[in-house]
């Protein structure tokens, strides 16, 4: 299967599908349609019924081959790639039997080394797909797309493998946080699903952050600095004061595991007006609410010293910890755990320090944990995919399809 995985992933990553957070359309970029239409064509070539809607959501169905009712399971992956780095002219490179030595990424001066990326030590002997250093690879999440396609193809070619009804979804704009926004859960009509959008071998994730975005605006009074005493209010200084009142250790670079944080994404402005953009993250809902409350308290503590309340805070929730919706249905995790065990894969159920489409879909009525794809160093030139781990991910999808038949409706 390795050759098929390499061929399919190479073809898909060469199609530029970068999303654009500045766009208001869905998909956010026209070029995402290029891969979506190709996938529709290939799925129909498998003999599947498909539907590609006006918003770029591609659904397909592999019908059940058993005579009794079992739950409908879904598998999802997103077609867009991150806007954080160049995604055009992707030139994938293959490293056979990775020996652990430093790999030069083309002529860019960039290298892939175990010193910088110690997780590579686990991949010695694997076949890797890497970049030439000039672009991201796009294995996030085209590896997931490939794994679903190859698993479906295998099930079609091996009708002796029994499975229930399987729904497939390829979606746009996950990288800019909009993946599930126009996902029609009712039309998808699955009982539960799995996103193939994880990273390291063995990941089985059903806990995500609670997430919000906060925009802070500070308003100043700008006068000539030579006569500014007791008159000038510097909006930049107010912004700095606001940030300094947050806990210094509760930032991404100083937290791990279940620890939440405030992350200052952008700070810009002048004496008259400044803006600070934060993301707020915490796995615990109560702690998450307290973090948002903290921002409002800081606002009030600063504003009390001014007549015109110069600090404004706007907070918008983005998604919630999907464990709230998945844990009441333990079989959704028990099924892949059984498959992992059968394949001698040690499950890593550590919480996601982020979110997936499943975070939002779970709250829309489709409980959706996340499974590994075998890729790493997403969103930049050091991105890689282990073809060996991708092969295991395909086996997991096939195994889940089989295992679901033991859970009658």
Curated annotation (Swiss-Prot):
Cofactor dependency: Zn(2+)
GO term, biological process aspect, one: peptide catabolic process
Taxonomic superkingdom: Bacteria
The keyword NADP is assigned to this record: no
Segment forming the signal sequence: none
Cofactor info, note text: Binds 2 Zn(2+) ions per subunit.
EC annotation from Swiss-Prot or TrEMBL: 3.4.11.4
Molecular function via GO: metallopeptidase activity; tripeptide aminopeptidase activity; zinc ion binding
Pfam name, any one: Peptidase_M20
Catalytic activity: Release of the N-terminal residue from a tripeptide
Compartments reported by the entry: Cytoplasm
GO cellular component, one term: cytosol
Enzyme active site: 80, 174
Keyword list, A-Z: Aminopeptidase, Cytoplasm, Hydrolase, Metal-binding, Metalloprotease, Protease, Zinc
Annotated function: Cleaves the N-terminal amino acid of tripeptides.
Protein family: Belongs to the peptidase M20B family.
Protein name according to UniProt: Peptidase T
């Amino acid at each position: 299967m390795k050759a098929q995985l390499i061929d399919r992933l190479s073809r898909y990553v060469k199609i530029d599908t970068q999303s654009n957070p500045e766009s208001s359309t869905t998909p956010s970029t026209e070029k995402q349609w290029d891969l979506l239409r190709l996938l529709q064509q290939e799925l129909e070539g498998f003999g599947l019924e498909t539907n590609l809607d006006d918003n770029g959501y591609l659904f397909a169905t592999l019908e059940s081959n058993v005579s009794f009712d079992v739950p409908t399971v879904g598998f999802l992956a997103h077609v867009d790639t991150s806007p954080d780095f160049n995604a055009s002219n992707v030139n994938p490179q293959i490293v056979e039997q990775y020996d652990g030595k430093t790999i030069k990424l083309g002529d860019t001066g960039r290298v892939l080394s175990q010193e910088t990326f110690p997780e590579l030590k686990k991949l010695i002997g694997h076949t890797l797909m890497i970049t030439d250093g000039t672009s991201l690879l796009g294995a996030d999440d085209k590896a997931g797309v490939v794994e679903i396609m190859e698993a479906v193809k295998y099930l079609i070619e091996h009708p002796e493998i029994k499975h229930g009804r399987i729904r497939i979804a390829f979606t746009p704009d996950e990288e800019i946080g909009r993946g599930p926004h126009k996902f029609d859960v009712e039309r998808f009509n699955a009982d539960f699903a799995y996103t193939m959008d994880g990273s390291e071998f063995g990941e089985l994730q059903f806990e995500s952050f609670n997430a919000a975005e906060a925009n802070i605006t500070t308003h100043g009074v700008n006068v000539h600095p030579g006569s500014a005493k007791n008159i000038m209010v510097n909006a930049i200084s107010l912004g700095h004061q606001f940030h300094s009142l947050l806990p210094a250790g509760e930032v991404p670079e100083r937290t791990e595991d279940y620890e939440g944080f405030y992350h200052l994404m952008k700070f810009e402005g002048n004496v008259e007006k400044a803006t600070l953009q934060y993301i707020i993250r915490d796995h615990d809902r109560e702690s998450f609410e307290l973090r948002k409350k903290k921002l409002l308290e800081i606002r009030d503590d600063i504003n009390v010293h001014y007549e015109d309340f110069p600090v404004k805070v706007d907070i918008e929730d983005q998604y919630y910890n999907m464990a709230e919706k998945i844990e009441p249905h333990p079989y959704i995790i028990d099924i892949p755990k059984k498959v992992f065990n059968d394949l001698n894969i040690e499950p890593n159920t550590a919480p996601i320090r982020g979110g997936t489409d499943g975070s939002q879909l779970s709250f829309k009525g489709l409980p959706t944990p996340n499974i590994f794809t075998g890729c790493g160093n997403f969103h930049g030139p050091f991105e890689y995919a282990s073809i060996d781990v991708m092969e295991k991910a395909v086996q997991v999808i096939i195994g889940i399809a089989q295992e679901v038949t033991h859970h009658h409706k």
